């Protein structure tokens, strides 16, 4: 049996231990993580309509997006996240990572409702600055990121994220392009405080001939028992980006805040 298969079995066992069904669940969420490459497909055609169609097919409440331009010369001063938000009737939250061609380049979150608050946290990235975008909602917290290509920077990012997660008394869901596969030192480090709740069988890059699983959705272990994952899959068959989206549906455990 390969190391990857052994790790996958271990992940599933860990998930079964931490992610349990609540007796009564009162809120269901569709969550997507997608590196959209500004709507540039694997065929190098810039067609944001394909991205919109892919996302619309998932009926998402939350979308975590990576590789977004904001009014750059490269994208003819278009606000890509805003266009996606308008087309999907969602609220945009943008976090710039770097200045680029008279604009910004970074990550974003789309949400059906406006967040209570948002926070941008810098992360290490020696080849390119990285960031963490945190959005608070009444019953949960969403964090979107795009890790550095450098393993050392990935490892340095994890304690920063753990510190942010520890501040919340509700589920902290982390999603993004982590630029690392299973197994790796980065995943091993994340597994100490988080549980992977997205699928781990289907590679997510490149979209035409997927070979690498580098996109994930996770939850902090402290609150993992407060959700139930009812569906987890990769959205295959799309060439709208060089990545394949990760999709999950979760049920949030019933509590006083959401059961009123």
Please report, for each region that a protein language model flagged, where it lies by residue.
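N-terminal, active-site-proximal structural segment of metallo-dependent hydrolase catalytic domains
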Residues: 2-7, 17-87, 99-101, 159, ...
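Repetitive helical segments and hydrophobic/amphipathic motifs
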Residues: 13-14
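Extracellular/periplasmic catalytic domains that process cell-envelope and extracellular macromolecules
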Residues: 25-26, 57, 85-86, 101-102, ...
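Active-site-proximal beta-strand elements of phosphoester/diester hydrolases
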Residues: 28-40, 119, 134, 139-148
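Active-site beta-strand/loop signature of hydrolases that rely on acidic residues for catalysis
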Residues: 29-36, 51-75, 142-145, 161-187, ...
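Structured beta-strand-rich core segments of catalytic domains in phosphoester-bond hydrolases
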Residues: 43-44, 52, 68-140, 226-236
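Sec-exported extracytoplasmic/periplasmic mature domains
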Residues: 56-60, 85-89, 93, 115, ...
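Metal-dependent phosphoester-hydrolase catalytic domains
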Residues: 120-122, 151-155, 163-173, 179-260
């Amino acid at each position: 049996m390969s190391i990857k298969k052994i790790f996958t079995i271990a992940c599933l066992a860990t998930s079964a231990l931490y992610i349990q069904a609540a007796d009564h669940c009162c809120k269901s969420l569709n969550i997507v993580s997608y590196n959209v490459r500004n709507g540039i497909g694997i065929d190098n055609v810039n067609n944001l309509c394909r991205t919109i169609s892919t996302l619309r097919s998932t009926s998402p409440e939350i979308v975590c997006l990576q590789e977004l331009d904001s009014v750059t010369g490269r994208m003819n001063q278009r606000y890509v996240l805003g266009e996606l938000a308008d087309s999907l009737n969602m609220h945009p939250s943008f976090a710039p990572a770097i200045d680029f061609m008279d604009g910004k380049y970074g990550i974003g979150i789309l949400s059906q409702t406006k967040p209570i608050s948002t926070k941008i946290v810098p992360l290490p990235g020696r080849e390119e600055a990285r960031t963490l975008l945190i959005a608070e909602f009444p019953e949960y917290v969403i964090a979107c990121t795009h890790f550095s290509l450098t393993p050392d920077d990935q490892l340095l990012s994890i304690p920063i994220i753990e510190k942010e997660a520890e501040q919340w008394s509700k589920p902290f869901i982390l999603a993004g392009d982590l630029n690392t596969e299973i197994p790796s030192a980065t995943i091993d480090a994340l597994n100490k405080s988080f549980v992977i709740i997205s699928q781990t069988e289907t590679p997510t890059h490149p979209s035409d001939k997927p070979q690498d699983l580098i996109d994930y959705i996770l939850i902090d272990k402290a609150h993992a028992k407060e959700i139930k994952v009812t569906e987890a899959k990769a959205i295959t068959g799309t060439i709208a980006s060089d990545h394949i989206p990760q999709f999950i549906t979760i049920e949030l455990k019933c509590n006083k805040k959401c059961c009123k």
